[in-house]
Amino acid sequence: MSKKSNKSLAFSLLGLIVSMVLLSFAAVPLYNLFCKVTGYGGTTNRETVSIYSKVKGTRPIIIEFDANVDKNLPWRFIPRQQRVQIVPGQNTLVFYETENLSDNDIIGTSIYNVTPNKAGKYFVKIHCFCFEEQLLKAGEKVLMPVTFYIDKDFENDPEMRDVKVLTLSYSFFKVRDVKK
């Protein structure tokens, strides 16, 4: 190989590495955008004001809560309640507890989904920590609220007849350390 082709190969490989690093930083925001646009993976609806606050269904549904943390993020993240039983149209407030176990301030972000996936379109979030980056100072512990309801149309959808339990699952990922 000539020096020119070696140099060309080196620049190509360097460009590939830089592209991969940039894509890894963009992966979580791009995934969130993809899920919001397509509804993929049990992505929920989001509202600022509940239109169903006075309209309640009759069919009880159990909502279970799940929490996961990426291995690169030294946080403890757990739901304060393992499950709640609600009816469609009932506004519900739950909390997740998050603690930074490191000696550094860290910014993290979460993604979420609802299973079974077919029920995600009926899960309406009113307020959630998942739409913003979260800064936790070293050793800090915080409660993160989620307000939601199940759309009343859930009861009328024949595909939802077999659904008795929904799971709201969050996964936190590290965005970056904060320089002191």
Curated annotation (Swiss-Prot):
Periplasmic side: 30-180
GO biological process terms held by the UniProt record: respiratory chain complex IV assembly
SUPFAM superfamilies the UniProt entry points to: Ctag/Cox11 (SSF110111)
Keyword flag Membrane: yes
Protein's recorded name: Cytochrome c oxidase assembly protein CtaG
Protein topology in the membrane: Single-pass type II membrane protein
Any one Gene Ontology cellular component term annotated for this protein: plasma membrane
Chain segments annotated as transmembrane: 9-29
First-listed, main subcellular location of the protein, grouped into a coarse class: membrane
Compartment list: Cell inner membrane
Residue ranges, Cytoplasmic side: 1-8
Superkingdom of this protein's organism: Bacteria
